[in-house]
Every structure is written in C-alpha cells, then in structure tokens.
Swiss-Prot record:
Classification via NCBIfam families: ssb
Entry-linked HAMAP family: SSB
Record keywords: DNA damage, DNA recombination, DNA repair, DNA replication, DNA-binding
Domain SSB per the UniProt entry, residue ranges: 4-109
UniProt superkingdom: Bacteria
Gene3D superfamilies, A to Z: Nucleic acid-binding proteins
Compositionally biased intervals (Polar residues): 126-159
Taxonomic lineage of the native organism: Bacteria, Pseudomonadati, Pseudomonadota, Gammaproteobacteria, Pasteurellales
Gene from which this protein is expressed: ssb
Protein name: Single-stranded DNA-binding protein
General function of this protein: Plays an important role in DNA replication, recombination and repair. Binds to ssDNA and to an array of partner proteins to recruit them to their sites of action during DNA metabolism.
Region (Disordered): 126-176
InterPro entries: NA-bd_OB-fold (IPR012340), Primosome_PriB/ssb (IPR000424), ssDNA-bd (IPR011344)
GO biological process: DNA recombination; DNA repair; DNA replication
Pfam families recorded: SSB
Amino acid sequence: MAGINKVIIVGNLGNDPEMRTMPNGEAVANISVATSESWTDKNTGERREVTEWHRIVFYRRQAEVAGQYLRKGSQVYVEGRLKTRKWQDQNGQDRYTTEIQGDVLQMLGGRNQAGDVATHQNQAGWNAPASTQNNYNQGASNYNPNQTQAYSAPQTNRTKPAAESVMDNFDDDIPF
C-alpha cells in the first residue's frame, strides 16, 4: 500500500520570501510560515497560545509568484509534501533539513494585503476563478473538463465573505 505525504498549512509569513536562482536558471523561494493554536487552560482559566514555524520551498513559476506578491505578514494557504534534504555546512559536516515542498500556493486575506494581484494574474494569462482568493496552482491539477467555470474581471468592491464572520465568533476551546 502506498503512503500519503501531504501537508496543508494556513498561516502568515514571518519574513519576506528569500529568493535564489538555481544553476539551471530556475527560481527558488523559501518562506517561513507561522501557524498558531490558542486555547484556555481548563485548570487555570489562563489563555495559552503556541506558534509553530514551517519552512516552505517553492520552485520555478510558483517561486517567482511568491517573490513578487508575498510579503512579511501575508496570509497564505499552502499544500505540499515533507521533504528531507542533505547538505554540507562550512566545515564539510553533513546536515539534514526537513521542509515542506510547496505544490499549491493560495494567497488569502484581502486585495489590500498583496496589491492588485488578480489584475496582474489576468494580464499574465493565468486562469483565475472569480473569487476573493488568488490560486497559483502549478500545472493543471485542478482542471476538470466536465466542469464549467465562469471567469470575470476582478471586482473593485468586495464584501467580507460570510465564512469569515462565522470564524470571528469561533470559540477556541478544545472540545475534549
């Protein structure tokens, strides 16, 4: 039986993307994304929070998009897989790093956060569903020939989605 190696992260960038170019000319972007959990301690009633930092690497076109549009504080949705790579430090010692290799990058938040991304997206010829989120999938992984989708120009006046208002009132207590 084949295993599953899938990671889904929703969080905020801790720094601007670190951009590099590989010897073959392909772009590489490294980002650091914070995810937080908060809860109320049942014994003390004290509010607790734990933040985890995740190293994520994107290659090729996704790296270019990340470098162009993401900034410190940007909220992102990332799908990818865990990868461990081996490298040598300055002393020649073998080191290992486990990171997420990003396959899907979706910018969350509002248009004010990342600029006029949807307009740039349409001018570049990418297929952009009309929504408040901008999807930067690599390849055609979400293509379904039997499904029809309507595409439209970006809207300038967008209202806050109902799902966000539900989450604003969400009780963070752990149910067990």
